[in-house]
């Protein structure tokens, strides 16, 4: 935490009558703090700083204490001696230690005294670097980092840190871990609007200052969202780009209310586009809401909600380079020319925008598609819907809504002790699509060679024609039984958690921290009928409870259906010692994790519970300042 000294300038000259104490109230960077409260202790006199931060209070000769308060900043008091002339007192307020605890304690951020390799990207630089890309792309110029947009679908980016993939990079938003509790992966499409709400992003490479039990061997990414602004106002921004890209962002802040105790902030984002790669369209919303309430000098509460309901077409299949350009492939030393020679599997090329995960379809096909994402038929759609585009069908589409709600409490117990806690809920509803049953490709592919033969595309019209004329009298006299369909692979989850950290300053050199990390999650996995592709029903044989097969229609569960619970409890203790040019850091933690699994497609439908897994975590580091510009750490 950067602590900047209060700057006070007093100018006194003699006079006979009541004079004024005047000055400016700014932050440490000299930005005016409009609306700051300026009061004279023990009196009813006071005022509010103007838009330029200026204040003025008339006082009789005497000695007074002037106190300035502003939400999100440390209150400051200064003794003022009034004589016979005006007195000028300028206040430069430092960010509140409680506010910084949201950054440093809950999110475990590193600073210049932490023996950690880190890079922090502020809001202005974030907007400049990122534009409308996925969040990882803002870090692509950071040492030891590789980020890629992969197939080009919105939100399909990934990041590697020091050679480790996202499963080994802890991602946190406002101090709350966001890695999947089952496999550790991070799905950036879930956070499509987080960059618009981000105040800064810090990437800690390798050993991190994070003391939670997170998969952070590669590093840790801390994303801090905008606090509720004390200044009233709004902003509208619109961005456009290739592929019919259009993004509109609206933000509004209420400013201070309720006696300068409450501030609210909100952002809403709408993003649409056809995509550069074929059929990688995007149809997304994003929202962010923040509230800050200063209950008293010792307690502040913050409420955050962020989410990004979205749908987008994907490009997931890897291709031989000759699929895109045979000329480019031929220029590569050592490339096997038989891969695209006449009569071989790459007789044609698809071009750079080629995408195997879609295909054209006749607009005469009016079949509905089923998908669900927190609200059937609601604001974000769901239920039985028309397909995204009447002229084509995506084999691979992602749709998901993962809201995150945090309630933070920051408490100053005394001058040496602070308590920071966050209670959170993270939901999740949506999934990805694919084929199920028999499929048609063009040009036709023999057997299972489809994954080696390219470029080919989907022949949806052939599939629809087959399914539309396929009466199976064993199941129904007149209705058509689909041979192949589109399916949803869905994930629905609810995660609740509590993170609490107590900081105690033992001395000027030593600070200790103890903490608790509790999480519990319930997760459902299944596949559903998305599109019957011209038929009236499909027969599925995956459920042991229906050994003769099960007739399914739009929205019905097929293939598999299981539920998982994850229960997590952990604790830690951490110490940070600073003396002159030396800084030492160390922490130790203990975590216990329990899993349960229930397969609903078994006759027993039994809940299988695994024994708890207990793990120990230990970290340590040291840093030595050689001079003000050079330091070494391990």
Give the ranges of each region predicted by the language model.
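Transmembrane beta-barrel wall of Gram-negative outer-membrane proteins
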Residues: 233, 240-272, 277-315, 324-326, ...
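Transmembrane beta-strands of outer-membrane beta-barrel pores
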Residues: 238-244, 254, 270-274, 307-311, ...
């Amino acid at each position: 935490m950067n602590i900047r000294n209060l700057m006070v300038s007093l100018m006194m000259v003699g006079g006979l009558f009541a004079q004024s104490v005047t000055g400016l109230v700014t932050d440490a960077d000299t930005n005016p703090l409009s609306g700051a409260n300026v009061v004279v202790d023990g009196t009813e006199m006071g005022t509010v700083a103007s838009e330029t931060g200026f204040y003025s209070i008339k006082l009789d000769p005497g000695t007074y204490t002037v106190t300035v308060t502003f939400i999100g900043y440390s209150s400051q008091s200064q003794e003022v001696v009034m004589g016979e002339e005006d007195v000028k007192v300028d206040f430069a307020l430092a960010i509140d230690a409680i506010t910084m605890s949201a950054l440093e304690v809950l999110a475990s951020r590193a600073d210049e005294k932490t023996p950690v390799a880190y890079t922090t990207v502020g809001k202005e630089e974030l907007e400049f670097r990122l534009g409308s890309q996925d969040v990882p792309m803002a870090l692509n110029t950071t040492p030891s980092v590789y980020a890629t947009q992969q197939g080009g679908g919105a939100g399909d980016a990934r990041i590697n840190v020091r050679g480790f993939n996202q499963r080994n990079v802890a991602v946190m938003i406002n101090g709350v871990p966001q890695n999947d509790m089952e496999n550790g992966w991070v799905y950036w499409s879930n956070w499509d609007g987080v960059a618009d709400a981000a105040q800064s992003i810090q990437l800690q490479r390798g050993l991190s200052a994070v003391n939670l039990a997170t998969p952070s061997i590669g590093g840790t990414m801390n994303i801090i969202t905008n606090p509720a602004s004390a200044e009233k106002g709004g902003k509208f921004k619109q961005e456009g780009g290739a592929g019919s890209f259009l993004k509109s962002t609206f933000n509004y802040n209420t400013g201070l209310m309720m006696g300068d105790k409450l501030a609210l902030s909100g952002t809403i984002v709408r993003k649409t586009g056809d995509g550069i790669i074929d059929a990688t369209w995007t149809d997304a919303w994003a929202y962010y809401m923040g509230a800050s309430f200063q209950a008293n000098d010792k307690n502040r509460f913050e409420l955050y909600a962020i989410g990004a309901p979205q749908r987008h077409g994907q490009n997931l299949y890897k291709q031989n380079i000759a699929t895109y350009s045979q000329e480019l492939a031929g220029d590569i030393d050592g490339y096997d020319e038989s891969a695209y020679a006449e009569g071989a599997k790459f007789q044609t090329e698809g071009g750079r925008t080629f995408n195997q995960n879609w295909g054209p379809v006749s607009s005469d096909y009016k079949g509905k598609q089923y998908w669900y994402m927190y609200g059937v038929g609601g604001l974000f759609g769901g239920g039985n819907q028309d397909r995204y585009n009447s002229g084509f069908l995506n084999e691979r589409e992602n749709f998901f809504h993962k809201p995150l709600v945090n309630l933070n409490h920051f408490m100053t117990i005394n001058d040496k002790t602070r308590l920071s806690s966050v209670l959170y809920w993270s939901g999740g509803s949506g999934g990805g699509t694919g084929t199920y049953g028999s499929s048609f490709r063009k040009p036709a592919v023999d057997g299972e060679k489809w994954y080696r033969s390219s470029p080919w595309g989907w022949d949806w019209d052939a599939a629809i024609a087959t399914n539309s004329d396929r009466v199976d009298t064993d199941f129904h006299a007149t209705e058509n039984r689909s041979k192949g369909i589109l399916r949803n692979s869905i994930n629905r989850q609810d995660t609740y958690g509590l993170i609490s950290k107590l900081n105690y300053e033992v001395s000027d050199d030593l600070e200790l921290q103890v903490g608790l990390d509790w999480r519990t999650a319930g997760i459902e996995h299944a596949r559903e009928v998305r599109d019957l592709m011209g038929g009236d029903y499909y027969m599925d044989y995956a459920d042991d409870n229906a050994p003769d097969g099960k007739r399914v229609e739009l929205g019905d569960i097929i293939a598999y259906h299981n539920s998982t619970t994850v229960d997590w409890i952990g604790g830690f203790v951490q110490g940070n010692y600073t003396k002159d040019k030396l800084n030492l850091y160390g922490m130790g933690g203990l975590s216990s994790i329990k899993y349960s699994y229930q397969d609903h497609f078994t006759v027993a439908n039994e809940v299988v519970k695994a024994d708890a897994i207990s793990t120990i975590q230990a970290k340590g580091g040291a840093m030595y300042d050689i001079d003000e510009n050079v330091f070494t750490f391990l």
